[in-house]
């Protein structure tokens, strides 16, 4: 399963990166994140072992919220504009996630992409279940809401000068 979400944000790349990297603050920033527990953190803060809990809105029916929870290792590379996650527990165990931040040469802002890749060790899970249920219904939906909300925060806070 591979899925990508991309959005352009008008704000300083360093500020966008910081908001994305500071996952322990996400529950206060992102209404669909219920909890982030940091189990371990490197002295630099560039590596964290965490448990994250979010909710998928309007699933399985409009108005309902479906809770999801997973463990992950996060590694940040600020100079490269990359944040990596490896899911270590939960329904998407083994999933790799890469956040990429790039300046847009056309002046649309900072291009922020979240890519998810998951291959289950049991092949029968890699078809419809991985693609439609995990990928489309949860991963893509939650990542899209995360990016849209971060964009609102960055641009609402008056962080419009991004160079």
Can you name each region flagged by the protein language model?
Residues 1-48:
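Hydrophobic ligand-binding cavity/cleft-lining segments
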Residues 1-6, 49, 69-71, 82, ...:
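Intrinsic-disorder/low-complexity, polar/charged segments enriched in Ser/Thr/Lys/Arg/Asp/Glu/Gln
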Residues 5-7, 36-39, 69-76, 87, ...:
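Hydrophobic/aromatic beta-strand elements that line small-molecule binding cavities or substrate pockets
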Residues 11-13, 54-60, 74-78, 89-93, ...:
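Beta-strand elements of well-folded, non-transmembrane domains
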Residues 12-18, 138, 142, 146:
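Short amphipathic alpha-helical segments
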Residues 15-20, 26, 74, 112-114, ...:
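Hydrophobic pocket/interface hotspot
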Residues 38-89, 144-163:
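Glycine-rich portal/gate segments that line the openings of hydrophobic small-molecule binding cavities
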Residues 84-144, 161-162:
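Beta-strand/loop substructures that line and gate deep hydrophobic ligand-binding cavities in soluble
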């Amino acid at each position: 399963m591979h899925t990508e979400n991309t959005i352009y944000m008008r704000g300083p790349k360093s500020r966008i990166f910081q908001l994305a990297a500071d996952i322990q603050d996400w529950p206060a920033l992102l209404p669909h994140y219920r909890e982030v527990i940091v189990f371990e953190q490197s002295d630099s803060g560039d590596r964290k072992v965490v448990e994250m809990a979010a909710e998928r809105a309007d699933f399985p029916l409009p108005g309902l919220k479906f809770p999801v929870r997973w463990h992950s290792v996060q590694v940040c590379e600020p100079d490269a504009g990359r944040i990596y996650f490896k899911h270590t527990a939960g329904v998407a165990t083994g999933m790799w996630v890469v956040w990429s931040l790039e300046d847009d040469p056309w002046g649309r802002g900072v291009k922020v992409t979240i890519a998810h890749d998951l291959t289950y060790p049991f092949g029968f899970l890699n078809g419809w279940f991985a693609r439609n249920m995990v990928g489309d219904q949860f991963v893509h939906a939650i990542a899209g809401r995360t990016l849209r909300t971060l964009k609102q925060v960055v641009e609402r806070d008056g962080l419009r000068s991004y160079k």
